[in-house]
């Protein structure tokens, strides 16, 4: 018996076991409303790769099952999000969303990269406003508002030109402290920057839920709206779907796009209502564990 003949069954058994566990975990995450099971919904890209690998080595009678699972996962990952891009004679509003990471070691370099992207509006989470490396960026974008905090919940929305309004809204939760989001208005359109707490325990998961519910009510009341943020939730999560339904907004970030390291999850989102043709460009990874999203909004 050759090494190849012994290795394939050994690999097939282990991949099959892992694939069953992944399939069960993902199915439960879509059915049971519980913060811990919801965590398993975010890893669909990883499950899809696993199912495809299992289909390649599994025994004949199981191969079709994992091929179908991989195909279904791949279709969900590649399913078009939002409205198709359309050409327009009017110039687009360029907005940049970026969770810059509270401990970013190179704020000056990040500022230069953002200036090179030349957005009209920039919204940032986890920004350390005491870091002088952000001063050049703030000077170029003097209008807007921010929530100053020495925590991951610092938040800023800055604009090159005057905004009609900009305010920090504190979402009340049972976690012992409120969490901020920003609501601004420019040219009659509403801009929202969100960063709810991560669901790493039951208390913070409930806080995220309360935060998203309060933000959804504000967003639903607006007419034309652009929402951006690190939502600490993926497109495959029932929590994410509930939020988009309650707020009556459509996601535009591609389902397959990784925006957060080290797990390569898609948790930074752009969502809109009232305009078609929104385009998203993911910028190269810099010094944060997130990547910036450049939004062209007609």
Task: Annotate each PLM feature.
Residues 2-137:
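N-terminal, active-site-proximal structural segment of metallo-dependent hydrolase catalytic domains
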């Amino acid at each position: 018996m050759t090494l190849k003949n012994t290795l394939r069954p050994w690999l097939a058994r282990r991949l099959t076991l892992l694939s069953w566990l992944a399939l069960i975990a993902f199915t439960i995450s879509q059915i049971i409303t519980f913060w811990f099971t919801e965590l398993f919904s975010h890893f669909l890209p990883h499950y899809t790769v696993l199912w495809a690998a299992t289909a390649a080595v599994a025994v004949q009678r199981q191969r079709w099952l994992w091929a179908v699972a991989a195909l279904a996962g791949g279709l969900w990952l590649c399913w078009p999000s939002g409205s198709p891009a359309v050409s327009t004679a009017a110039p687009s509003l360029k907005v940049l969303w970026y969770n810059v990471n509270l401990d970013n070691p190179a704020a000056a370099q990040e500022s230069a990269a953002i200036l090179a992207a030349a957005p009209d509006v920039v919204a940032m989470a986890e920004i350390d406003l005491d870091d002088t490396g952000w001063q050049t960026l703030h000077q170029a974008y003097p209008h807007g508002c921010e929530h100053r905090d020495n925590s991951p919940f610092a938040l800023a929305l800055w604009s090159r030109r005057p905004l009609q309004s900009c305010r920090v809204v504190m979402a009340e939760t049972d976690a012992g402290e409120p969490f901020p989001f920003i609501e601004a208005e420019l040219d009659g359109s509403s801009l929202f920057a969100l960063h709810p707490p991560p669901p790493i325990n039951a208390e913070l998961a409930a806080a995220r839920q309360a935060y998203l519910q309060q933000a959804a009510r504000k967003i639903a009341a607006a007419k034309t709206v652009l929402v951006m943020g690190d939502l600490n939730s993926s497109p495959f999560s029932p929590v994410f779907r509930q939020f988009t339904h309650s707020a009556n907004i459509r996601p535009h970030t591609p389902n397959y796009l990784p925006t957060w390291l080290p797990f390569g999850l898609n948790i930074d989102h752009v969502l809109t209502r009232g305009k078609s043709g929104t385009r998203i460009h993911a910028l190269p990874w810099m010094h944060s564990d997130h990547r910036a999203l450049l939004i062209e909004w007609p």
